[in-house]
Amino acid sequence: MAVVLALGMCTTGLTGCGNEKRADGKTEIEVVSYKPEAVKAFEKIEKQFNETHDDIHLTISSPNEAMTILKTRFIREDYPDIIAIGGDINYSNFLDADLFEDISDLDAVDTVKKAYLDMDKELEFIPKDGTYALPYAANAAGVLYNKDMFAENGWKVPTTWSEFTALCNEIKESGTLPLYLGFKDTWTCLAPWNALAVGLCDSDTCNQVNMGNTTFEEAYSPVADKIRTLLDYAEDNPYAYSYNDACTAFARGESAMYTIGSYAIPQIKSVNPDMNIGSFTFPANDNEADNVLNSGIDLQFSVMKACKNKEAAYEVLEYLYSDETIQTYLDDQGGIACKDGDFAIPDTLKDMQEYIKDNRMSDYQDHHYPSEMSVDAMIQTYLLDTGDNAKEKFLKKFDSDWKRYNRDLIREVQDYQKEQEDAK
């Protein structure tokens, strides 16, 4: 919350966005993106925009450590016009600090897939009227699988938890390792955790906890059970193997499946460029209709309140949201378009296509977790604990640590609740 407080102090004098006219008479619009890996795509988009616009000059920068740079600039009241970040806790903090412009009147907002607009609303600590981000590109996480291995053995993609465990048993009996986990790097523990949680918990679980309507001990109990079940089908001592180890092992055919997001595919293909990889939604439930795809907003654009040229910023956003520009970005970076329309879906995500089309998607639970809480390490510690009360200890700690690291936020949420009740 320290970041929020610091940012909140500087919203009273928004003076940045020095968008005075350039020497050539054009209005300068600056976009800062947190994705250095997309620099080539943005350079191409920037060039195409500037070649087709006489009155606006667009500059898109994608620096390393962009979030640190942005936070420093915000404290100095040196604001870009637009920022391009993910739909996660940073977005929540910046929104809570009242840094973003309401862009509800932007035409492009009407073309965003509803699921992604809903995700952004759930990232609001306190409900706000309006729309404060334009979701652009999303990712998806479930279970990667070796399509050739599946075809050769007649294995079918599972659609329920029972089918999944039965498949794991069948693969194990054939002499092949069903899963690779690679839990040495603690962050990898969050991949199956998130993918299971979206199907087993309400998407607003964290907010419900803040309001006092539930506890993590109650909400996360089935998630804790099922993530532990994965250990029965994985490599011995997965805590000895890193993310790179797991990618390499899966690429070499040492397991049939890998519980990681599609973002791991480039790393896997660097080892085995010809590998035929698929990805399916984690079937967390025994009723397929209850399953939900774990998808989150990887990139979205927000206009800063300090922007002096909202009309020019809107023109930039409308250009960025054209089908052609979105496809330029996706061709370079992959992923899922947040805009409704006929956009190509990578072959590796084809098994998830119906979920995407039907808006059966929910955000990563960890997008709501404060980084100081180190939930990834908590999950790893829980899985290492073989005691009878391991789950109880883990979930009680989850609740107590949540209160510790979100004390101010919980008070803010509950004060808001009381105000709403008093106003009735």
Predicted ranges, named:
Residues 170, 209-239:
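Glycine-centered hinge/linker elements that transmit conformational signals in sensory
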Residues 86-141, 165, 171, 191-194, ...:
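Hinge/lid segment of periplasmic solute-binding proteins
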Residues 99-102, 263-267, 299-373:
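Mature extracytoplasmic/periplasmic domains
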Residues 72-73, 80-81, 110-148, 177-181, ...:
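A structural signal for short loop-to-beta-strand junctions that line the ligand-binding cleft
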Residues 151, 360-424:
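Conserved C-terminal helix/tail region of periplasmic/extracytoplasmic solute-binding proteins
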Residues 48, 52-116, 148, 152-153, ...:
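Extracytoplasmic "Venus flytrap"/periplasmic binding protein-like
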Residues 127-136, 141, 165-212, 255:
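Extracytoplasmic/periplasmic solute-binding protein
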Residues 51-52, 57, 129, 152-153, ...:
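Extracytoplasmic/periplasmic substrate-recognition and gating elements
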